[in-house]
């Protein structure tokens, strides 16, 4: 993988995480009655989505419908069968109950 490809992958991950974080912040602001602030966070999240989609397209991560469905099935299957069971096991071993609940939900 070239440096640029690594940078694109890192940028995609960062923009994607920022999107989800800003949406979580917006939800919190709504709960606190701060609708204007929530709107700002949603706008920032939307901008991050545009950036993430651009990086994903350049990386060749958006294909035809059949391929997109297969990538989704494979990814969700991995999470369900391998990733989360291991995460749950490790969190249980560390006695981190909130993490166990988060990984199960």
Model-derived features: positions:
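Non-heme di-metal
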Residues: 1-105
């Amino acid at each position: 993988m070239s440096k640029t490809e690594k940078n694109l992958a890192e940028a995609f991950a960062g923009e994607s995480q920022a999107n989800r974080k800003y949406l979580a912040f917006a939800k919190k602001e709504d709960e606190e009655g701060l609708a204007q602030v929530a709107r700002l966070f949603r706008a920032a999240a939307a901008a991050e989505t545009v950036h993430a989609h651009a990086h994903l397209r350049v990386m060749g991560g958006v294909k035809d419908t059949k391929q997109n469905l297969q990538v989704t099935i494979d990814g969700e299957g991995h999470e369900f069968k391998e990733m989360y069971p291991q995460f749950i096991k490790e969190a249980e071993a560390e006695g981190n109950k909130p993490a166990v609940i988060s990984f199960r939900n």
